Amino acid sequence: RMLRWYDDVAAPVARNIAKRQGFKGLRWMKMTDPWAGEAPSNVGSFLLWQQPHYIYLAEEMYRANPSDHTLKAYAEHVEQTAEFMADFAKACDRGGQYIPLTGATAMQECMRKDFSYNHPFELSYWRYGLTVAQKWRERMGKSRNADWDNIIKRLAPLPEKNGIYQAGLPSKEEPRFDEHCYSDHPAVLGAFGLIPTQGIDSIKMRHTLDAVMHNWHWETTWGWDYGMIAMTAARLGEPETALQALLIDTQKNTYLPNGHNFQTPDRLRLYLPGNGSLLTAIAMMCCGWDGCQQPLNPGFPKNGKWNMRWEGFNRMQ
């Protein structure tokens, strides 16, 4: 049903957004109404991290039903989604060894478009999206797109410092940049936990997870962050940390008796991304993910204290 909304309602609007901005393909909107209008915001139109969602969701549909019917249903918009991604990356290319991603506000929204660049989640999701879009071309009997392969190869590596992945690189000299990195969404962990990992050092990510757990300003986080952290910890083989993340004692990790994920009293008394993140994390911790070596409950400690019962889950990408 969600992809039908993308296909039937949002795609014409997304095509116009890309065209208006001088890009090919479809630029999916971040904050929208049921009719795919862009919601008023000083942030939403500068976000990129929603762009590969269509590719991720289409891949989920193919995994559930790997058929020609599925390919024909979604291949066109997978292609056009990737066309924008490639065109945007080309606009960022300055001819160096690596292609940076610039001019966008990060999922970690305190990392603004004019403050930082090379945000880790966006870099990882861009690489994932273009890689999967190439698979779709091959499934459709097409040759790989050489431009996309060049971008995949040359996308900048995740920024790091002292063996810890960073929230981005400063656009200009900023004395308090490091302090700024420990607020808002811990998006750097999403680069490993939310999507299949590509070219990320698990040891460095483990150090990054430890730095987040000990230094983050939790009052600035949001309800879906805790599930994201748990999924990262699970992929790293840290089930105790995964549970700790789900149970972080902070206001925005509050669930009311009616199930709503309460955020603040003045706004967002319910927050469905928090519910979605919690449910996704629990399912992933039970069923695992592609390449996971443990057949059952990899996200829970093997200390004899957990007796899990579940059914109907599929492994996460």
Annotate each PLM feature:
Residues 93-103, 291-302:
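A glycine-biased, small/acidic residue-tolerant capping/turn segment at secondary-structure junctions
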Residues 9-52:
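Active-site-adjacent "gating/activation" loops or surface patches in catalytic cores
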Residues 296-317:
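Surface beta-strand/loop "capping" patches
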Residues 80-139:
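Acidic/histidine-rich catalytic neighborhood
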Residues 1-12, 43, 47-64, 72, ...:
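Active-site core of glycosidic bond-cleaving carbohydrate-active enzymes
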Residues 1-2, 17-18, 88-91:
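Short, solvent-exposed loop/turn and secondary-structure capping segments
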